[in-house]
Amino acid sequence: FLLGAAVAHPLIPERFSARMRMQLLSSQPSLHARLRVTASRRHAAPEGGACGDTGAIEKAPDGRVILLLADGMGTGEGARRLSRRALALAREFLECGLNEFTAYRAINRLSDGGREAFSTLDVCEIDPVTGTARFHKCGSEPTWLLRGRTARRIEGASLPVGVVAEATPSVASAHLRPGDAIIMATDGLVNALGGEPAAEAWFQTLSTLSPAAFCTASLKEARSRNRAARPDDMSILCARIQKRSPLLDRAPALPDPIPDDPPAAQPDTAAGP
């Protein structure tokens, strides 16, 4: 009955009925999921001001885990508004199941292009059933996939969102294994660590840490290496891939993905079936 109402009721707008159908069909966790994702993020702003970066760890109705990190142009409140808007639009469209190219065209058209107001956007969608990760990059820093002693750098050449209406993201994919770690960071943190090669070397030394410990250690190291330079907003998100265990199936609720003030410290968040 509920599914029929969601499909056919004339008073329900189409965009909401589509979401209702997805939620009704996907409300139960998949019994076939073989992976579990735990993730954490950290943000830091110069001298305690507003951080222009925004991050989120989401679980879509169909079971996908979506990691998002955005860096608004500039610093302070203006940058934060830009990054929050870009991230909110990406979250909304991707959770509804739109493919990435359609979603990012819509984001670009809804953004303030032409007024030099743009934001980078770094997204990773993880399917815990198939073990596939898809990376969407719009003007963002590389994403690192750590596996044992090796590191794969995932890069893209696309423009930030809001620059060109028809721009699409750079897209890559990877097959995940238990023990893998996914690292996403903004340019403030990567530059503070000494650039991409130095950041990669640092990340590899932390490959066995929990996501929360990984993020905390990376921010601390970035601050210590960057004492003489003008500080920038710094953000990092770390996700750890684990083999699913029935004993861990009751995951805590995910936090609000866009808090009024990005937290300096956020505990590990369990996501996935």
Positions of predicted regions on the chain:
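Short, surface-exposed beta-strand-loop junctions and turns on beta-sheet-rich folds
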Residues: 73-74, 140-143, 150-152, 160, ...
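Active-site-proximal, acidic helix/loop segment immediately C-terminal to a metal-coordinating Asp/Glu
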Residues: 74-96, 165, 176, 180-229, ...
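N-terminal entry segment of metal-dependent catalytic domains or homologous docking segments
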Residues: 10-73, 78, 84-88, 167-173
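Intrinsically disordered or compositionally simple regulatory linkers and C-terminal tails
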Residues: 24-34, 38, 241-272
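Acidic loop->beta-strand submotif enriched in PP2C/PPM serine/threonine phosphatases
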Residues: 49-62, 118-121, 153-195, 227-231
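Short, solvent-exposed secondary-structure boundary motifs
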Residues: 42-49, 111-115, 132, 162-166
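Catalytic core of PPM/PP2C metal-dependent serine/threonine phosphatase domains
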Residues: 1-29, 80-149, 155, 169, ...
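Short hydrophobic-aromatic micro-motifs
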Residues: 65-69, 135-136, 182-185
